Amino acid sequence: MAQAQYTGTGRRKNAVARVRLVPGTGKITVNKKDVEEYIPHADLRLVINQPFAVTSTQGSYDVFVNVNGGGYGGQSGAIRHGIARALLQVDPDFRDSLKRAGLLTRDARMVERKKPGLKKARKASQFSKR
């Protein structure tokens, strides 16, 4: 029989992560690279592992992620969101703890667009009275 496989899609800023959970040893692979190689910042790797910490399932699943768009921070948030959604398929009873930790909510904050006549979204050139 084929091994159980759970999927979830996570999004954050401009990053989209498609996550596959397979029962295993806890190895995380992002875009066919090891997570330590793909994401150099240790604090962002902690962000990725938050759903496992909340549900006490560390080391229970191998994670295969396909992520594109955004930078390291956005991609880490997208992976976290995808893992949380995939864990819901594993056990619907996880919903309460994941929701309380805020891991199922899509972070809606996006970069504000640049406005014409300004240097950036809100930065204007210095005002001169005379």
From Swiss-Prot:
Keyword line: Ribonucleoprotein, Ribosomal protein
GO molecular function: RNA binding; structural constituent of ribosome
Keyword Coiled coil applies: no
Top-level taxon: Bacteria
Presence of the UniProt keyword Ribonucleoprotein in the record: yes
Pfam families hit by this protein: Ribosomal_S9 (PF00380)
Stored PROSITE patterns: RIBOSOMAL_S9
InterPro entries documented for this protein: Ribosomal_Su5_D2-typ_SF, Ribosomal_uS9, Ribosomal_uS9_bac/plastid, Ribosomal_uS9_CS, Ribsml_uS5_D2-typ_fold_subgr
GO cellular component terms attached to this protein's record: cytosolic small ribosomal subunit
GO biological processes: translation
Family the entry assigns: Belongs to the universal ribosomal protein uS9 family.
NCBIfam families in the cross-refs: PRK00132.1 (NF001099)
Name of the protein in its database record: Small ribosomal subunit protein uS9
